[in-house]
Amino acid sequence: MVIIDRLCHASLIDGAKLSGAILRSFPHNNLDKLEKILDATCKANNKDNRILIVTEGIFSMDGDSPDLYKIVNLKKKYNALLLVDEAHSFGICGEIGKGKLSEYNLSEHADFIMATFGKSAGAAGAVTATSKIWRDLIINKARSFIYSTAPMPSQAAAASEGLKIIQEDEGNLRREKLDSNINLLCTKLNLKRPEGAILPIMVGEESASIEISNKLFESGIYAPAIRYPTVARGSARIRITLSSDHTNTNITELADILLSQKIIK
C-alpha cells in the first residue's frame, strides 16, 4: 500500500498508480488522518502489509513542509517505509544543501530520498538515494526506469558540476544570499517566511491571477499564474520562486508591483 499526501507532485501519484499497489491519500499535511489510515491498515492486515508513506520536503505549490519528525515517528510505530521527495529543498536546505531531512537530522530514517537536478543544480535528471538492496530491486524491476533512456554525457557532466557548486563554498554563499533574498521579500510584503524559495501569493480568482502575472511580465518579471487544474478551483496564485542571483533591486520592484495590485492581505 502507498499512502501519499494529497498535494504530492503528479509524478509521485502516477508512479504510485503504476506500481499496482493500493493507493490511499491523506489531506495535505494532516498527520492525524495519516495515522488513522496506518492504524486501520495494520489492524486489518495484522501488520503484514508493506506500507510506503510518501511526502515532500517542500511542497511545490504551497511552499510549506510537513512535520517530518512526526512522520518519522509514525513510520517507526507502524513499521512502514518512507519516501521523501526533496525536489524543492535539495540544494537550499540542510547541511551543504542535502534537503529538509538533513536539516532536521532525519536522513537516516528515510528509505528513499528523491532529488532533482533540474532546479538548484541547474541541469536535468534526478536521483533516488536508497540502500543497496532497494537500489538493486529498482534497477531490475522498475519498468519505467528500465525502459528510460540514460542521461546524455553532457547532461550528467552539467549535473555533476552543479552538485560540486552546491556542496562547496560557493554553494554556502549562494544559500546565504538566497536566505537574505527570501527575508527581504517577506519583510516588504509582510508575509510569513516560507520553508524554502517558493512563495505563493494567493489570489483566488483565475482571471485575476492571469492579469497580475501579465502585469509582472510587462515589467520584466516572469511569475506564472498557477490555477486549476494544477491547484483547486478558487485557489489561483502567483508562484514566486527566488534565487541567489536576484538583486535587492529586483526584489523591491517585484514587491512594489505586487503591493500595487492590493492582493497582499
Residue ranges of predicted features:
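Active-site phosphate-binding strand-loop segment of PLP-dependent enzymes
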Residues: 22-84
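Conserved active-site segment immediately N-terminal to the catalytic lysine
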Residues: 78-79, 86, 98-117, 136-140
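PLP-dependent aminotransferase class I/II
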Residues: 114, 120-184, 190-193
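Pyridoxal 5′-phosphate
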Residues: 27-31, 44-57, 87, 92-97, ...
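Conserved PLP-anchoring active-site segment centered on the Schiff-base-forming lysine
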Residues: 1-10
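Active-site-proximal loop->helix
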Residues: 10-20
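Conserved PLP-binding catalytic core of the aspartate aminotransferase-like
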Residues: 174-186, 190-220, 230, 234-235, ...
